[in-house]
Amino acid sequence: MVLRELLSRTEQIDDLCHLFGALGFQAAWEHVPPGPWLGTGPAEAAGVVRAALVARHDVFRVFALEARDPERAVRAAAQRLAAHAERGLACALGAAPRRLLCAGWRAAARGPAIRVAAIPLERPPGSSLETLERFSPRPRETALALSLRVGEALASEAVTPRFFRAFRATLERLTDRLSTPRSRAERHTLALTAFTRVLFLYFVQAKGWLDGDRRYLIRRFDDCVAARRPFHRRVLDPLCFGALNRPAADRSGAARALGRLPFLNGGLFEPTALERRHGAARWSNSDWRDAFDDLLERFHFSARETEGGDAVAPDMLGRVFEGVMDPAERRASGSYYTPAALVREIVRAGLEAVLVHRLGLAPAAAERWIHRGQPPERAPDLRRLTVLDPAVGSGAFLLGALEELTGLRCAAGEGPACAVRRDVVAHSLFGVDLSLTAVRLAEVRLWLALIADVSAGPDDPELARIAPLPNLDGHVRQGDALVDPLTLARALGGAPAPATPASELERLSSARRKLFGLAGAAKRDALAGLARAEAGLARELLRAAVAALERRSAELVAAAKDRDLFGRRRGLTADTRALLRRLRASRRELRAAAARLEREGGAPFFAFESHFGDVLARGGFDLVAGNPPWVRGERVPARVREALATRYATWRPARGRGFAHLPDLAVAFVERALELAAPGGSAALLVPAKLASSGYAEPLRRRLAEGACIERLAPSLAAGGAFAAAVYPMVLVTTRAEPTGREQVATALGARSTTPLIPQRALAGDGPWILARDAVRVARHLGARCVRVGERWRPQLGVKTGADDVFLSAQPGPATRPAVRGRDVGPWRATPRVHLLWTHAPDGRPLARLPPALAAALAPHLDRLGRRSDYRAGPAWQLFRTALAYAPCRVVWPDLARRLAAVVPDPEIVPLNTVYGIATREPDDAYALAALFNSRWLTALARLHADPARGGFRRFNARVVRALPLPPASPSVWRVLAEQGRRGESDDDAIADLYQLDAADRRALAAAPDPL
């Protein structure tokens, strides 16, 4: 507090004596003539009015300058100190905004490096105060040692992408230093576990809780280096496993020698199963020196999620989690960091729906409480409100729910905030994730949230009575929220979950509550009690599921043995035979799980009914919120796809012409979220925006529109840049309740009374959800009155090679044709940038024998070409989907573009498989379609139905173009359109007249260029 007050009172350089005196320097005041000291040129250039020596430590001197350009002045002074190899610091005061500028120098390979730090004088963040504190001289410290430390403090960086790169590089280096276990994935997990502990210690250290020293770890490390002792064995091991995880009275002498340290409980500070199996991972002093220099001491740490962007705050653990995953792993898991501001708005939207539908508040009262902090006169009790994140990631949504529920309860009169926050974690928050790393990071963020506002300072005698960190083992679990063997077995067997005795459910709930606040031997007993409660529920659930599978199998066999009217046995159809195989496989899996339960004593896998059965018995969770994985169905393993199709009614391939796209994994998560929500409860999810338009999501859209209340359907286009996935996000908030037909859907986040609304009934029926109401009216009117493109022509994809590196060349050759990708096509233009080895005859069939030059080029690749996924039979050099390549008349457009952009290409040009096209019999048809497709009206209509992608792009695939209306046009009018196409122009007004669009229709389409 002293530093904050001194900074706020600093008005002129004379006041810096008091500031540096408070830091432990010897105060001084000696005038220094600016010109002779700095040099006339630098002094005049910076506008230095006066300079003075204001503090010293040994021969380390602190100078203050008053100047017109304060940053230029301190840089000049630091350069002067460096030129004379003097130890010191230069300071100046800046205005607008008021700030203290400090500059120093440190030796570098290419000469002295000048470092400048700017410290706000009003409301300085914790990171700035830490920088000042790092200037403090230590007892008996030499000027050289102080100068080196000041240089390190000035070199500390604000958080930039460099932090995340440095984190990943450090983690990879620590992983590579380990020799065991053999699996690199396990070594990576061990390194991440240990490094997560150190990160947590840096956050705790920032509060001054490690022996009152905000520089505790680096000082202990320096002491170990000076004494030639291993830092990991002498400090980290006893700190984590002998001090922080034990009450002070139970610590060994070595642990007590580490200083005054709080008891933070086990959890993070106890060996994991992997560490118990392979032994704790340890690194040398050299490895830790690199970690300190490259990462830990380079950036500021703050235990507050809301700390300014110049500090490493706990919410960055989400981005760290995303950063330590390589891109292929991230795409496979669909795990993406969600920005905190977006999380807050999604959680608020979900809680607002819960307050209205689950707890009975009036909409206006719920909005005031959520968005203005004004509780109703009789506020409902939120102490048992439950929130689940079924794909918890790094815990962003649980943290968001923690802050919002704490705020609501404190606004209603509960307090203090730290006690309410702990109670929310104890009773309201639950999470699941497949990744153990994600579970650990979520726990760390929840623990940090609990200590962030604890007021005990480093010298506070209450430090010893800081509440130990709670045990979250019963709240955040590793497991599969979508498909566990029990729910899959019930889907196959067609049996509901059995009723569970209330005594068993109370035993589970009581065990979780008891475990939350215990430590030591009592904690171990409570953990065993929780495991027994979960195992007891799992045992009965497994028994009932096996019985259901056996009944269903017996029914199928009995039906197969039944005889028809002619006395013949009916037998098993192919479908029933496949179902019987899966029933028996599921039964084997459950029996093996039951045997493992009896052998090992714990539940063999995570299931909501066994681990959170007490919550489900009350109907379910009040709010299910999160950012579930976005994974294209084609990337999901075949066995998992089969399970999803069995388990979820809405997870079905798109039906229609052409390739049947598999649903995104997010489809199943939406259905699952509503299952887990209690009646009147809500699901608030961040999902791919393409769920509103893709054909594969139509069963889900129909189910939501007809069987639930849709509260929000809000495209988050503004968040697309901050969001790292490859498609636009959309916020979907639904309530588990039957719609009445009067529901209104908000199409934006924020206070509901200020957002645009559309009737939910407008979302019913087939087709995409379109939020631009006036444009929808125009589109439906045209659809009812006009013939569609798909009724006359068939849009199709261009040529697919299956081996672009073999068939495509930058240079033309005797056996090549110019080719275009989607990015090479625009309105009225197709610019070939590659050339395709052409292996087909003019009629489209593959050549039976290749010309010698072509045969020689392809000969080394024939085995590979025969293994392409599209290859079935015939010459190995054949290409696929060649119809557009040899069609004499065709119009083509890119699959991915900001607008529908069409061209009639030269006959020699081959469209590749990121280009769609239509082959026509007559050239006039191709040119007329180009004129229509390039008009603003067809682009607007196409964008209404096209799936969104990043950067404002849309996917203008065959489904979208098939549905476009064709204007009623006589042959003469069609010829006029064709002439426009030949000239490379579209007459928007004339085309609007052809469609009979009045002024209101044109305004509606013009106003909705990007409706979703």
Stretch-by-stretch model annotation:
Residues V320, I346, G393, A442, ...:
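Conserved hydrophobic/aromatic pocket- or pore-lining residues that grip, position, or stack substrates
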Residues M1-P36, P42-G47, R75, E86-L89, ...:
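Signature of N6-adenine DNA methyltransferases within the class I
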Residues A43-L129, T272-R276, R289, R632, ...:
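Polybasic, glycine- and aromatic-enriched phosphate-binding surface used to engage nucleic acids
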Residues D484-F605, A617-L623, R635, R639:
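Basic, amphipathic N-terminal segments
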Residues R246-S335, K523, L530-G567:
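A short N-terminal interaction module
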